[in-house]
């Protein structure tokens, strides 16, 4: 291989290595984002379930008279 082609070959190798690392990083980030979205979805469902339970508990709670003084008065 001529001397003038050596730097080009080295540059090409460096670019290929760099792309390989970038591909690995992209895959890792994609997996992380996917896991985070799954966790967000699960937490959103959990919050909705808690909200529904709270609404149900509030609707089943006995209504307090509006003008009644608290017992400590």
From Swiss-Prot:
Low complexity: compositionally biased ranges: 57-67
Species annotation: Rhodopseudomonas palustris (strain BisA53)
Highest taxon listed in the record's lineage: Bacteria
Name assigned to this protein: Protein SlyX homolog
HAMAP family documented for this protein: SlyX
Annotated family: Belongs to the SlyX family.
Start and end residues of each stretch annotated as Disordered: 54-73
Pfam family for this entry, one: SlyX
């Amino acid at each position: 291989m001529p001397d003038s082609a050596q730097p080009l070959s080295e540059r090409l190798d460096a670019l290929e290595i760099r792309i390989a690392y970038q591909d690995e990083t992209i895959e890792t980030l994609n997996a992380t984002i996917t896991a985070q979205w799954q966790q967000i979805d699960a937490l959103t469902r959990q919050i909705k379930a808690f909200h529904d339970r709270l609404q149900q508990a509030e609707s089943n709670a006995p209504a307090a008279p509006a003008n009644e003084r608290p017992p400590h008065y």
